Amino acid sequence: MPTGGSTAEQAEPFFVTGFQRSGTTLLRMMLDSHPEVAIPLDTTGLWARAERRLGEFEPLEEEANRRRLVESLLTEERIRLWQVPLSVDEVISASSRPGYPGVIEGFHLAYARSKGKSRWGDKDPGNMVRLPSVLGWFPDARIVHIVRDGRDACLSLLKQPFGGDDLLRCAEQWREQVGWVRQIGKILGDGRYHELRYEDLVEDPEAALRPLARFLDLEWSPQMLEYHRRVEESVPEEKRHIWPLLDRPPQASARYRWKREMSNGERICFEKRAGRVLAEFGYETLPGGASGAYLTEAMLAAGRVRAAVAGRLPGR
């Protein structure tokens, strides 16, 4: 693999993933600010959904069928949110990969070229549970996994309209998904899997990003630290409310909010379900695991309290 200056045709694609509200968008913005890299807004399961419809367009070896598939995908909302007017010809001609992976790569390469860049990546938290599909499409892909303390990730997620209201279920999902991705990473090995923590990224961005750049065979670029100056061109206005802090440098104060916002009961209940995995990722947990004094409080508080704080339970 060449280092720095590598073209999209020479370099493997990479996929950024992580549990929801764990800094995937922040990391996407930083990488997208590199002069060689283009990562559009989340595809949010688009490629998996389209794969289930491939029977309507087969065989893809026939260009007419590939064109029909691309035409269909160009009408998707997730592609519109990329804010780049792509044509069927641009997508078809961008990639020489055969079959459906070539269509996916064609979209990403066409997007990258529209930005004057050579390297493409995809960012989607949902890829945590779809990694077998991703690796089936792109056996040479590299995986970038950003991990955030599950207590903070869940607190943030439950404040979102799409986040649900069950803290305990969120704890279980965080435990299962980050553990699952790490296990896949062990199979892939260090050459194809890179893991970093959100807390380290916001505390010292350059120290966290330099190893990631090396992993992706990219030369270091200080432009990655200037991501907050590019929000208007990189995030559609209709979506900016989801990430209100993107237009400023990393906020170290965003770390460990659970210490201020979680009750003892919520913390114990969360750690009952995910404490072992929290500890495996180097996060602080109660000595000896959650037990005893606050258990009743925990069971009463879990799930409902976070929804009440977010103002979504009428009359509370």
Regions found by a protein language model. Name each.
Residues 38-122, 127:
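PAPS-dependent sulfation machinery
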Residues 35-39, 142:
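Catalytic donor-sugar/metal-binding loop of nucleotide-sugar-dependent glycosyltransferases
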Residues 25-36:
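A conserved segment at the C-terminal end of the G1
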Residues 18-19:
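P-loop (Walker A) phosphate-binding loop of NTP-binding proteins
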Residues 108-249:
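PAPS-dependent sulfotransferase catalytic domain
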Residues 24-25, 150:
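Conformational gate/switch positions in structured elements
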Residues 1-15, 98, 158-161, 178, ...:
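PAPS-dependent sulfotransferases, especially Golgi type II membrane carbohydrate sulfotransferases
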